[in-house]
Amino acid sequence: MIGKINKFNFKSLLVLNTFALIATSYLFNNFIFIGVFILFFFLSLFATKNGLEIIRKLNLLQNIRTEGPSNHFQKSNTPTMGGVFLMIPFFILLLIITINLSSLKLFLLLLTIFGFYITGFLDDYLSIKNKENTGLKTKEKFILQSVISIIFILLAYEKNLINPLVILSDSWVINMNIFILPISFLVLVGISNSVNLTDGLDGLAAGCSGIVFYGLGTEILMKEQQELFVFSILCFSMSGLCLGFLKYNSYPAKIFMGDTGSLSIGATLGTIALLTNSVFTLSIFSGIFIIESLSVIIQVGVFKITKKLFHRGKRIFLMAPLHHHFELKGVKEQKIVENFWKINILLIILGIVLKIKL
């Protein structure tokens, strides 16, 4: 009984996120936020359940890389490409709002996310077709992401939709000038790939994404800018979609989101943060994603340097990304995911406190 009480699982996260959104709705005197979250949670359940049946009929099954942890081989043949169905309700919402508001910001947001969605779809499709864990080559995927990101950044910068001023507080403002361009590129490509790297354990990326979208939506509300209100709605809808998907993606996963889902989610976070000048706060909220990505960069970098210097590569971690390191240390998959969720919740609290204090 004690073990069950202490377990922090999908239901625990859903209840916590729901109460947090009720509190947010109460504080900002607008219950549309909790309404949007609940609506898209159930839309996600519906889309994922029906999508799962379609995926099984089409035999779209996950291939597991041989160099990964041995306990992952049992995940082979799990239905994948769930992100295809996860994102459909969001695209419909975004398209409707974009048409009604005739907003260039929202139009660029829609095109950018859809570009990453197609990139992920191609990667997933080729992976299944070739019966390998990877579809597009790393360079091919990076080129596609880069082209999409550069088009968005240049158009947004030209129309003054990206603010070069990084506002940390009322008295601490940094003017990035032209350097906002490479920073924006790093944010967009970086966060999308970081979410993709985090999507290696059942429920890890979906759970963390649901948490981060809540934090980002709340932070945008705290800016008290009427024109940004719609972005909070989009964030809370994505939070609901991610947690709805988590119902089927938590351990043991019945479906994976694939690159279609992870790249789309990351692109949504990055693009919204850039358009709402929330990059600094997102960097705190997305601490788990960033650490996962950094663990890969450090692992590869150290290995290459030591191999060149000592003719024998050394590794910092047993395996990267970081969640695999803990797996090989003997920590159970569910426990790793639960702890990462808890850390992410603390990062949301930290980011919001800093927003209030600064």
UniProtKB/Swiss-Prot annotation:
GO terms for cellular component: plasma membrane. InterPro entries: Glycosyl_transferase_4 (IPR000715), PNAcMuramoyl-5peptid_Trfase (IPR003524), PNAcMuramoyl-5peptid_Trfase_CS (IPR018480). Its cofactor is Mg(2+). It catalyses: UDP-N-acetyl-alpha-D-muramoyl-L-alanyl-gamma-D-glutamyl-meso-2,6-diaminopimeloyl-D-alanyl-D-alanine + di-trans,octa-cis-undecaprenyl phosphate = di-trans,octa-cis-undecaprenyl diphospho-N-acetyl-alpha-D-muramoyl-L-alanyl-D-glutamyl-meso-2,6-diaminopimeloyl-D-alanyl-D-alanine + UMP. Pfam families: Glycos_transf_4, MraY_sig1. Belongs to the glycosyltransferase 4 family. MraY subfamily. Catalyzes the initial step of the lipid cycle reactions in the biosynthesis of the cell wall peptidoglycan: transfers peptidoglycan precursor phospho-MurNAc-pentapeptide from UDP-MurNAc-pentapeptide onto the lipid carrier undecaprenyl phosphate, yielding undecaprenyl-pyrophosphoryl-MurNAc-pentapeptide, known as lipid I. This is Phospho-N-acetylmuramoyl-pentapeptide-transferase. It comes from Prochlorococcus marinus (strain MIT 9215).
